[in-house]
């Protein structure tokens, strides 16, 4: 039988009457060190047999390990006898190390559900889950990683829950959010904390060493006052960069609000399919430079047919002026584009565009940092997409510790693979 269990050899193998095979193995060497004093002994006190779990091998396999119980060679040692332990079968192990490696590879590397992996390997769910949980200890300490750029973003942990107060009888809505902290240079998730307020992020940052915090130079966030407060309070040397995606999203929301308001003012109802502005509402949100000549002609037709006040076109122009700011390559270009943006806002003269312009002005220092450094939350958003895939694979999680373990291990594996395939580049997490 070719069993290939490292440091072990097969001494017997029989086919079982009901199918499968029983394989009896023994270690290549008898000698082992005492777990208390470390003195190596080869004197056998007795032999014992232990049934252990191993990876499937040409069908169902029942593995029996013949272990020697050794006598400690040190007379002053308090332990008289001990059982042999190896790298594949540590002390009190009931599964081989290669089985645990196989479980971890299937769950983390290939993203399979723990329940499905446990069933395919013939072990209990808790055995597979404990293997995943124990792998967290093998991850490098965050304080030991050389991190200079961070990305912070939130994601919803699970569906909205309603809880009833036993004293008042009132119901309260709870949205379970988690905040993801990512190394934006390589996309590795460094931490996942409960909540999306400043206290959650501050708690994680203050747990890092002062030297680690002093090395961080740029932090990319969405336009969140809570994240901004946490970063400015805990990272004194870091500049804040606001993510361009979220700024464009705010611009699109501004256009949508103007369109909805005009629909009520002009038609005294919500938009319908017969209204060109509603029928082509997604066209209004597209970047003008991404449109084909046919799309640009259709956009002009929509604004000419369903924008009697000109406010919708003005709001669209403000949104496009913002995109020109974000497309700038230098601070001088950005400031010149900001001047044109302000002119568009004055010409639009609507409440929606004024509020939008106030937001851009408030976050202008962070916008300049984004343009100067090029740091965005793109890899943070990519990490959140991978996190959502993990959540869907597990059909949701009731235990947040298990959820965070899957996220950190999966992200560390992807970052390690990225380093192996990107040698010589700047994509390095260490």
What are these regions (language model features)?
Residues 36, 42, 171-175, 183-188, ...:
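Acidic/histidine-rich catalytic cores and adjacent linkers
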Residues 38-41, 46-150, 154-161, 213-214, ...:
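Short, positively charged, Gly/Tyr-enriched micro-motifs
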Residues 42, 127, 131-218, 225-230:
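RNase H-like nuclease fold core
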Residues 117, 151, 220, 240-243:
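A structural signal for short, well-ordered beta-strand segments and their strand-loop junctions
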């Amino acid at each position: 039988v070719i069993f290939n269990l490292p440091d072990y050899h097969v001494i017997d193998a029989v086919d079982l009457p009901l199918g499968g095979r029983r394989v009896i193995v023994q270690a290549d060497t008898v000698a082992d060190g005492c777990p208390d004093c470390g003195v190596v002994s080869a004197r056998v006190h007795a032999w014992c047999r232990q049934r252990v779990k191993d990876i499937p091998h040409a069908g169902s396999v029942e593995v029996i390990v013949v272990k020697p119980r050794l006598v400690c060679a040190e007379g002053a040692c308090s332990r008289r006898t001990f059982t042999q332990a190896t790298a594949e079968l540590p002390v009190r192990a009931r599964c081989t190390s290669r089985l645990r490696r196989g479980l971890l590879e299937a769950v983390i590397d290939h993203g399979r559900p723990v329940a499905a992996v446990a069933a395919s390997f013939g072990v209990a769910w808790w055995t597979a889950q404990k293997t995943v949980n124990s792998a967290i200890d093998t991850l490098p300490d965050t304080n030991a990683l050389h991190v200079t750029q961070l990305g912070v973003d939130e994601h919803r942990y699970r569906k909205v829950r309603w809880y009833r107060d036993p004293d008042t009888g009132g119901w309260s809505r709870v949205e379970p959010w988690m905040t993801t902290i990512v190394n934006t240079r390589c996309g590795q998730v460094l931490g996942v904390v409960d909540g999306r307020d400043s206290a959650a992020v501050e708690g994680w940052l203050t747990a890092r060493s002062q030297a680690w915090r002093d090395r961080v130079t740029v932090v990319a966030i969405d336009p969140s006052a809570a994240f901004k407060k946490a970063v400015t309070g805990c990272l004194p040397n870091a500049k804040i960069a606001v993510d361009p995606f979220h700024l464009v999203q705010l611009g699109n929301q501004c256009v949508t609000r103007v369109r909805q308001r005009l629909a009520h003012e002009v038609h005294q109802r919500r938009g319908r399919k017969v209204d060109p502005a509603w029928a082509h509402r997604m066209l209004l949100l597209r970047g003008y430079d991404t449109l084909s000549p046919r799309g640009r002609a259709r956009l002009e037709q929509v604004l000419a047919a369903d924008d009697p006040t000109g406010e919708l076109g003005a709001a669209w122009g403000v949104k496009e002026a913002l995109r020109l700011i974000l497309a700038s390559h230098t601070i001088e270009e950005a400031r010149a584009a900001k001047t044109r943006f302000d002119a568009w806002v004055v010409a639009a003269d609507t409440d929606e565009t004024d509020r939008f312009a106030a937001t851009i002005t408030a976050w202008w220092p962070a916008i300049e940092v984004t343009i100067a450094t090029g740091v965005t939350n793109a890899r943070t958003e990519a990490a959140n997409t991978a996190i959502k895939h993990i959540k869907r694979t597990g059909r949701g999680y009731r235990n947040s510790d298990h959820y965070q373990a899957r996220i950190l291990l999966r992200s560390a594996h992807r970052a390690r693979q990225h380093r192996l395939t990107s040698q010589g580049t700047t994509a390095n997490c260490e």
